[in-house]
Each structure stands twice: as C-alpha cells, then as structure tokens.
From Swiss-Prot:
Optimum temperature is 40 degrees Celsius. Retains 14% of its maximal activity after heating 1 hour at 70 degrees Celsius. It catalyses: digallate + H2O = 2 3,4,5-trihydroxybenzoate + H(+). It comes from Bacillus subtilis. Signal peptide: none annotated. Optimum pH is 5.0. Active from pH 3.0 to 7.0. Belongs to the tannase family. This is Tannase. Activity is enhanced by the addition of 1 mM Mg(2+) (more than 100%) and by the addition of 1% glycerol (22%). Activity is reduced by the addition of 1 mM of various metal ions, including Hg(2+) (98%), Fe(3+) (95%), Fe(2+) (94%), Ba(2+) (92%), Ca(2+) (76%), Co(2+) (70%), Zn(2+) (44%), Ag(2+) (14%) and K(+) (8%). Inhibited by the addition of 1 mM DMSO (75%), Triton X-100 (42%), sodium azide (40%), beta-mercaptoethanol (34%), Tween 80 (22%), Tween 60 (20%), EDTA (18%) and phenylmethanesulfonyl fluoride (PMSF) (7%) but not affected by the addition of SDS. Monomer. Keywords: Hydrolase, Serine esterase. It comes from the Bacteria. Its EC number is 3.1.1.20. Hydrolyzes ester bonds of tannic acid to produce gallic acid and glucose. Exhibits no cytotoxicity in vitro in Vero cells or in vivo in a rat model.
Amino acid sequence: VQPPHSHGDNFYIWT
C-alpha cells in the first residue's frame, strides 16, 4: 500500500 500523496484525497499527510 502506498502513502496518500495527493492534493485531492489527502493533503500530503505522509510527507
């Protein structure tokens, strides 16, 4: 599973 790196679903929470 890949971390959410999108400005749509999640706002770079796993940065």
